[in-house]
Amino acid sequence: MEHPAYTLSLLTTAGGLMGYYRKGSIPSLVSGLVFGSVYGIAGYLLHMNRDGGLEMALGASTLLLGAGVIRGMPSRFTKPVPVVLTALGGLGSYYYYNKYKEFYP
């Protein structure tokens, strides 16, 4: 269950770094590093069977989904970055919501 969190950690960190190197965007760098760190911590907690990992991954995925939708609406999802953010957030939210329902019926 921790593999999606580690994957999302890598992808969000790489996306933040790419946004910084291509456009010099400090907000992209900060958000990529923050989301990457949160997903990394969630993955670690899930791997160690500690409390809070599932909720942390679900919360980060929901925020990522919201950020993608908010960024995509003005451009009607014609730009690739909001589409990727929305897709990653949606997939993460779907996965971790189903896992949450599985463990806490």
From Swiss-Prot:
Q: How does it sit in the membrane?
A: Multi-pass membrane protein
TM spans, by residue?
Answer: 26-46, 53-73, 77-97
UniProt xrefs under Gene3D superfamilies = Transmembrane protein 14-like
A GO term from the CC aspect: membrane
Which keywords appear in this protein's UniProt record, sorted alphabetically? Membrane, Mitochondrion, Transmembrane, Transmembrane helix
Domain of life of the organism encoding this protein: Eukaryota
Concerning InterPro entries, the annotation shows:
TMEM14 (IPR005349), TMEM14_sf (IPR044890)
Against PANTHER family, the record matches this protein to: TMEM14 PROTEIN HOMOLOG YJR085C, TRANSMEMBRANE PROTEIN 14, 15
What is this protein identified as? TMEM14 protein homolog YJR085C
Source organism (scientific name) = Saccharomyces cerevisiae (strain ATCC 204508 / S288c)
